[in-house]
UniProtKB/Swiss-Prot annotation:
Catalyzes a reversible aldol reaction between acetaldehyde and D-glyceraldehyde 3-phosphate to generate 2-deoxy-D-ribose 5-phosphate. SUPFAM superfamilies: Aldolase. The gene is deoC. It comes from Gloeothece citriformis (strain PCC 7424) (Cyanothece sp. (strain PCC 7424)). It catalyses: 2-deoxy-D-ribose 5-phosphate = D-glyceraldehyde 3-phosphate + acetaldehyde. This is Deoxyribose-phosphate aldolase.
Length: 231
């Protein structure tokens, strides 16, 4: 398959995700092969798959991102830190960390700060803090964004995809709050190139999706390919 400049331009934003609970080693092989084929910069996977992914992507330009505390964010800070350290030791270079939403709702800002800061400081990796914007008020979104930026997160990620996907409105809101201080990752429910490009236009620097290959194929033959069903 030959990729055009426009294909590669969209591909450069995609974190190619394999985050279904039933994912097999064979599916991970396919995910990594697709990331390499389509020039996606990152695969986003569960910690259990990091070692295999690092081996599969040896000498490739694709980075490995592990999700931490995913998808609920309700494990202890000690557990999240251990999970993050182990992912780093196994070769992950990025971490998508789910914040504790219960703490946010209860006003426990310091607990959230300490948790994210400890992961950032002790691993030294690129950390994307997942906010789950679909279950937050605008006030809570702003507070969560400010806490995670102060704690050292490099990106704010809209959602896990388990409770609704990214919206243009939320990406714009986070862009306004962050003022370019950190990146924004739009994630979940991205099914068409038009949607992907609209999220980028709104301010997204990364797109988290399992549909990356389909997005590129739709760009190549938009009249022949129907939007796929989301996972």
């Amino acid at each position: 398959m030959t990729l055009t400049d426009s294909d590669i331009e969209l591909a450069a934003y995609i974190d190619h995700a394999l985050l279904i609970p039933t994912a097999t080693p064979q599916q991970l092989e396919q995910c990594c092969a697709e990331a390499d084929q389509f020039h996606f910069p990152t695969v986003c996977i569960y910690p259990v798959a990091v070692k295999q992914a690092v081996q599969l992507l040896h000498n490739k330009k694709v980075r490995v991102c592990a999700v931490i505390g995913f998808p609920a964010g309700a494990t202890t800070s000690t557990t999240k830190l251990y999970e993050a350290r182990e992912a780093a030791e196994n070769g992950a270079t990025e971490l998508d960390v789910m914040i504790n939403l219960g703490w946010l709702k209860a006003g426990k800002s310091e607990d959230i700060y300490r948790e994210i800061a400890s992961i950032c400081e002790e691993t030294g990796l690129t950390v994307k803090a997942i906010l789950e914007t679909n279950v937050l008020t605008d006030t809570e979104k702003r507070l969560a964004a400010e806490i995670c930026m102060d704690a050292g997160a490099s990106y704010l990620k809209t959602s896990t995809g388990w409770f609704g996907g990214a919206t243009i409105a939320d990406v714009r809101f986070l862009k306004q709050v962050t003022k370019g201080q950190v990146g924004i990752k739009a994630s979940g429910g991205i099914r068409t190139p038009e949607q992907a490009l609209a999220l980028i236009e709104a301010g997204a620097n990364r797109l988290g999706t399992s549909k990356g290959p389909d997005l590129i194929r739709q760009l190549q033959s938009p009249r022949e390919t129907k939007p796929p069903e989301d996972q």
